[in-house]
């Protein structure tokens, strides 16, 4: 363990000496601050695309952002409602779950959300 520490110390001292020597020579220190022309050209080419990466195409009005912020709070309410519904589903017996399943099959027109709720109910009851 000590030998690793000593090796690290020697490398750090030698590296520090070479960096100090490079900065004392004025010509060497300027080499570190120069930018290659290829890198500068690439940087200027991609500047516009980097700025536009996080923007959504097609929305220029500010009303869309306020609507999105409002929806965030309603989704929290929806999550709470779903968790309450899940707790209620856990309390149902298998017989009442079968009745709900039969009622769901009897109704021909179920919305997508109702079908999803029915699948969740059946999955919860099959897990018990």
UniProtKB/Swiss-Prot annotation:
Q: Does the keyword Secreted apply?
A: yes
The task this protein performs is described as: Effector that suppresses flg22-induced post-translational MAP kinase activation both tomato and Arabidopsis. The perception of highly conserved pathogen- or microbe-associated molecular patterns (PAMPs/MAMPs), such as flg22, triggers converging signaling pathways recruiting MAP kinase cascades and inducing transcriptional re-programming, yielding a generic antimicrobial response.
Organism, as annotated: Phytophthora infestans (strain T30-4) (Potato late blight agent)
Q: What is the lineage of its organism?
A: Eukaryota, Sar, Stramenopiles, Oomycota, Peronosporales
**Keyword annotations:** Host nucleus, Secreted, Signal, Virulence
Comment block on domains: The RxLR-dEER motif acts to carry the protein into the host cell cytoplasm through binding to cell surface phosphatidylinositol-3-phosphate.
Per the UniProt entry, the signal peptide is: 1-22
Q: Where is this motif: RxLR-dEER?
A: 52-71
**One cellular component GO annotation, for this chain's record?**
extracellular region
Q: Which family does it belong to?
A: Belongs to the RxLR effector family.
State whether keyword Metal-binding applies. Answer: no
**Main subcellular location:** secreted
List the protein's name.
RxLR effector protein SFI2
Where it sits in the cell: the answer is:
Secreted; Host nucleus
């Amino acid at each position: 363990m000590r030998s690793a520490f000593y090796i690290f110390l020697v490398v750090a001292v030698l590296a520090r000496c070479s960096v100090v020597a490079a900065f004392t020579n004025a010509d060497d220190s300027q080499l570190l601050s120069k930018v290659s022309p290829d890198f500068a050209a690439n940087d200027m080419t991609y500047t516009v695309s980097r700025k536009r990466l996080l923007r959504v195409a097609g929305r220029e009005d500010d009303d869309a952002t306020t609507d999105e912020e409002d929806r965030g709070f309603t989704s929290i309410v929806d999550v709470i409602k779903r968790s309450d519904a899940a707790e209620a589903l856990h309390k149902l017996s298998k017989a009442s779950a079968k009745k709900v399943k039969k009622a769901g099959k009897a109704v021909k027109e179920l919305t997508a959300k109702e079908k999803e709720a029915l699948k969740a109910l059946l999955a919860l009851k099959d897990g018990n």
